[in-house]
Structures are given as structure tokens and as C-alpha cells.
Amino acid sequence: MKCKKCDQKAVINLQHHNISFCKEHFLEWMRVQTERVIQKFHMFTKEERLLVAVSGGKDSLSLWDILWQLGYQADGLYLDLGINDFNNYSSDSAEFTRRFAEERGLQLTSMDIKAQYGESIPEMAARTKRGHTKPCSQCGLVKRYLLNKLALDGRYDAIVTAHNLDDEAAFLFANVTHWSLDYLGRQYPLLPATTGFARKAKPFCQIYERESAAYAILSGINYIYTECPYSDGSKQLRNKRYLNMMEDEQPGFKTQFYLGYLRALKAGAFPQQQESAAKLEEKRCAKCGQPTQSDGLCTFCRLVNK
Ligand code: FES
Ligand code: ZN
Ligand code: ZN
């Protein structure tokens, strides 16, 4: 197996593209692909300030590295969720992230949820006792809220997350099987800013998980290998497995599935519900001022306020 570009021994074969690369040309290919997606969806420019959500995992550190190498002004945000019960997931991932930023001289903001709000994510979830043992929904809510808040407070032009093609295809699969039209109308990789909400972009939306892992390993990025202990047995992981089976039989399946969705979205197949600015101004959280659909407090303030 030889590199398509230089004829040297290849270290990776991308079956769905039917190409192989040596280390150097694979890393270059990843940067080119990411830049292409940024341009294709008009995500952001080099003059804008970006806030990258980093977890210490392969996807977010690879993305941050690529954005930095491409010359984007990308700062990192790490949220310490306080998930240390089964392994040291949060403490270890905080350390990987800190070292990554330090080695490159990048700006990293870290927030310890427990220090800030008095409870870790598992503690918040246990208190709210919604009949679920896992804290994933509370965790998602807190992460979305704080990422948005810190981006707005820091006057960033866009929030950047490292959702890869496997993540997007698995969400899509779940949303299609449940016919969640509401979600299907919102899964575009670029969501423009609206009242109270920062712009959100996903530059890895066409990058396979395997590729972002290979990028991290081949470029010597130290990242946390363990997953969040609560992700075990999740629907998202199960859907990823199903899609991997399809991909094994039909290389390129995930790409086709995702790009087909984007075409359908563009053709108006799903309602793209963008709340109008006036509507968002109507109701504001009494505590934090965020637009909210409920009276009084927003869901985040209700969760941390109890
Ligand atoms: Fe949030 Fe696992 S519960 S990362
Ligand atoms: Zn090569
Ligand atoms: Zn609020």
C-alpha cells in the first residue's frame, strides 16, 4: 500500500475515498478537508474569534490542533463535569487538555462546575431524580448552556464543536427512526447566531471518527482514551455500531447518508424552525436573562437553583 501523493509506504487507507496516505500526507489531507468544510458552509473566517469546546478526547484536540495549524484564532473551553466516580474521567481529561494548550501556547478557559455551582454533574442529576440513573441529559443541558454563555460573555464570534461524521450520522439515524422533524430541521452543521445564542459550527461533520483518531495518534497528541463512564450502553453508541455495520458492507455509507440529509434539508424536506428575534425577546429567564420558553427561570437556572 503506497501513499497516493509521494509513493512512500502508506500508514492509512481510507476505504470510502479509495486512497492511502503516508503520515505526512494524511495530516495534510485532514487539514485540507477541514478547511474545505469551513469554506463550504461559510462557517467562520480567520479574522473571527472562535471558542472551541474541548473535552480532552481525540476529536476536540485534533480539531483544535488543525484550526491552530490553519491559522484560525481559536481559544479552548474546558468544562470540568466532576465525573470521577468510576474512573478519573474528568480529572484526567482536564490534565490532557491543560497540557495540550500549554505545549502550543493556546488560550484555555476552564470552568469547574462543582466549584462554580456547588455540585458536580452526577450530583445534580441524583438530586433532580428524574427516574434516570444516568446524568447525560442534565450534562448535555449544562454543557450547551455554559458553552453558549461563555462564548457570549467572551464576545466570541462562533462556538466550534468537534462532532464528527459518526456522531452526526448517529444523531441523524436516531432522529430519522423517530421522525423527530423538529431535530431534523436543526441538524445543519452551521447554526447562525440569534438573540441570546452564539453561532455554532461543526467543521468535522464530514470527518470519520477513525480519521480524527488517526490524526491525533499520528501527530502525537496525547488524549484521553477512556470514554465518559455513563456513555456505556447509550443509544448513541448502539446507533454508531449499526452504522459501522452498514459502512463495513458499503464503504462511504455514512457520508452518503449525511450528505443526502443535507440535500433534503436544503430542498425544504424538514421544517427549519428558526425562532424570530422578536419571539426570543418575548420571554427571558428571570435570573440569567437567557431567552426561554417557560415562565420564570430557564431550564438551566431551574436545574442549578434547587
Ligand atoms: Fe456528560 Fe457523560 S454524562 S459526558
Ligand atoms: Zn505521502
Ligand atoms: Zn436562566
Question: Which residues does each predicted region cover?
Answer:
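Flexible helical/loop "lid" subdomain adjacent to adenine-nucleotide binding pockets
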Residues: 39, 166-170, 174-204, 209-212, ...
